């Protein structure tokens, strides 16, 4: 059995990950931790998550539990994620990162760190969303420059980063499909007298409201018609299930960064 350490164990995603780990035949929930000052520290995580004790006591920080597991699953915050990645690299522990909002510099550091540990890093671990990424690239390549590309994403009002990592990945895949550099053509805000739309630009717009789990639509709009491809999440369980799948797949792999295309066997599609 692969022993799993869950970061932010008492949080919303940490609890959903716990359920998916418990349901996975190859995984064992071995350790949990929270940041200093969290009221869950010192308590049995089973009572918090499952309503009954499972013998896993919430530690203070990753270092306090790093020896207890084989792989860390993290859906916390980008600065915390990088701290955990440095610790994972030091100890040679595998890590699954579902945190979004990592900066260019943080991603570069993560790549360097991955020489010392295997890591799955993905903006979205849903099977359907990763299929959507592939569809975005292939559709953009087929339709070409005659179709405007726009992306709309919606999430709950507690989400800290915008646009979502999923929306950015969608835009990157579409840009690849039409041979563009997203850094040059991405548009994230429109306000005032902006003039006509540049036919090469890719728009990415954001909504934040109430308890929306996550919705993404990519539009390919041409003269007289448009194609919309959408994904709507009804719960966080599909993210958590993907993370559990990634954890089971990752342990024992060579050091380096992998993504969900690797985990799901989608690289060549």
UniProtKB/Swiss-Prot annotation:
Residues engaged in binding NAD(+): 8-13, 34, 98-100, 122-125
GO molecular function: 4-hydroxy-tetrahydrodipicolinate reductase; NAD binding; NADP binding; oxidoreductase activity, acting on CH or CH2 groups, NAD or NADP as acceptor
Pathway per the UniProt entry: Amino-acid biosynthesis; L-lysine biosynthesis via DAP pathway; (S)-tetrahydrodipicolinate from L-aspartate: step 4/4
Record key words, sorted: Amino-acid biosynthesis, Cytoplasm, Diaminopimelate biosynthesis, Lysine biosynthesis, NAD, NADP, Oxidoreductase
Cellular component terms per the entry's GO annotation: cytosol
Subcellular location, principal: cytoplasm
Positions with a binding annotation for (S)-2,3,4,5-tetrahydrodipicolinate: 156, 165-166
Record bears the keyword Lipid metabolism: no
Entry-linked InterPro entries: DapB_C, DapB_N, DapB_N_CS, DHDPR_bac, NAD(P)-bd_dom_sf
EC number(s) given by UniProt: 1.17.1.8
Subcellular location: Cytoplasm
Keyword Magnesium: no
Superkingdom of origin organism: Bacteria
NCBIfam families found in the cross-reference section: dapB
Purpose of the protein: Catalyzes the conversion of 4-hydroxy-tetrahydrodipicolinate (HTPA) to tetrahydrodipicolinate.
Family: Belongs to the DapB family.
Name this protein carries in UniProt: 4-hydroxy-tetrahydrodipicolinate reductase
Gene assigned in the entry: dapB
